[in-house]
Amino acid sequence: MPSCDEGMKLTRRQVIAGGVTTVAMSAAPGASSLAAELATPPPPRPPVVSTVALTVNGKPRELELDTRTTLLDALREHLKLTGTKKGCDHGQCGACTVLVNGERINACLSLAVQHQGDAITTIEGLGTPDDLHPMQAAFIKHDGYQCGYCTPGQICSAVAVLDEIKRGVPSHVQADVSARPRATNMEMRERMSGNLCRCGAYSNIAEAMEEVAGVTPGRRA
């Protein structure tokens, strides 16, 4: 009695016969048109658009946006507020930091439609060349930048950090998270760790923040 393996073996004749059958079927009427139809991709779907109402730098703005649009792209491409920078576009550098209802976020990681009715503050809304925010003035005084690309995000984040400390929001650097945080050099550096400066102006940034916070420069926890 033949084994199962022997029963499953194909002869050369059977392989050739199978190939001929396949060729014949593909040559049948309508086969080529069916293949072409299957190979043609369906037309792209139009984007889903939504109306997004925001308050940006104190002004009400209404945008018709693809629901996939990030807050960063809404600000830069639709509202032309290019002070907010696109760095890594993956939430790892902090260049796109803006304030949403007073809280700092990475605008590249957030969809604009998630912020219906929110108040957005960008670097343009913090101050102007003729009326600088205290943090902007301190960055200039202490050379808290070199190329300047990360500076808008650094300043927005720095403003939010001092507000967090003032409100008593704890951080990982605190030995006792139940204690009220202090605006020390180490505390501020820890909170600013998500904002990268490839030029290495970190010490100057910390000095600028210390001045605005009203603490002795260089004081450590």
What role is predicted for each listed range?
Residues 2-221:
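Signature of N-terminal electron-transfer/Fe-S-associated modules in redox systems
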